[in-house]
Amino acid sequence: MKNLCIIPARGGSKRIPRKNIIDFLGKPLISYSIENALNSGIFDEVVLSSDDEEIIEVALKYGAKAPFVRDKNLSDDYASSTAVVQNAIEILQSQNQIYDHVCCLYATAPLLNKDILKQAYEKFIQNQSKFLFAATEFEYPIQRAFYLNENNQVYMFDEKHYKSRSQDLTKAYHDAGAFYFGTSKAWLEEDFIFKPHSSVFVLPRNLVCDIDTIQDLEFAKILYKVNHESAF
């Protein structure tokens, strides 16, 4: 079995300029994902998909490969991760590089470690599912969520759960925005990941942080320090 890790990292991040290579406790943010992928020992190649020369240079420094430059039409705010992964698989196939399994690992997942990737891969192989992705439990019961209408009035999505006890409600999970294992065939079929043909690797909340704002970035640094307390 040949395994490929693809790390998408475009250069045009808006809310945090140069997010993928911004300093994160002394190293570029993307370096954590590259090193974890390499040190996990499960990938034959760790490949960057980027349109940005500086990001490519940083990724090469930390051991990733960059055999192509991503097209600009796959580098805007509307390009999906699935399309980026498909593009990478197809380019590598045209270079006679064929892989059985492909992992999309986000550049913004510094809270992971190599052992998590190894355990997730083992579960993916054991389950024989099309996909396996990182998920985490919602902190609050989603059944008791509400919304505000145009007049800022409160409406529950489902009033029957107003008096329900939290422990009586079904647990709900969300995508952790960290990694996605899949067979090459499944990726190229462009099948929807959030279906019964997928399985999940549940992460504790202290390993999950969606880095979209400067506040998110600073919170991720705090989590990293807490998780690696002995190193600081």
UniProtKB/Swiss-Prot annotation:
Q: Does the keyword Nucleotidyltransferase apply?
A: yes
The Swiss-Prot or TrEMBL record lists the needed cofactor(s) as:
Mg(2+)
InterPro entries cross-referenced by the UniProt entry: CMP-NeuNAc_synthase (IPR050793), Cytidylyl_trans (IPR003329), Nucleotide-diphossugar_trans (IPR029044), PseF (IPR020039)
Catalyses: pseudaminate + CTP = CMP-pseudaminate + diphosphate
Q: What class of enzyme is it?
A: transferase
Q: Which Pfam family, an example, fits this chain?
A: CTP_transf_3
Main role?
Catalyzes the final step in the biosynthesis of pseudaminic acid, a sialic-acid-like sugar that is used to modify flagellin. Mediates the activation of pseudaminic acid with CMP by forming CMP-pseudaminic acid.
Instruction: Name the PANTHER family for this protein.
Output: HAD SUPERFAMILY MEMBERS CMAS AND KDSC, N-ACYLNEURAMINATE CYTIDYLYLTRANSFERASE-RELATED
* UniProt name for this protein: Pseudaminic acid cytidylyltransferase
**Organism annotation:** Campylobacter jejuni subsp. jejuni serotype O:2 (strain ATCC 700819 / NCTC 11168)
The encoding gene is: pseF
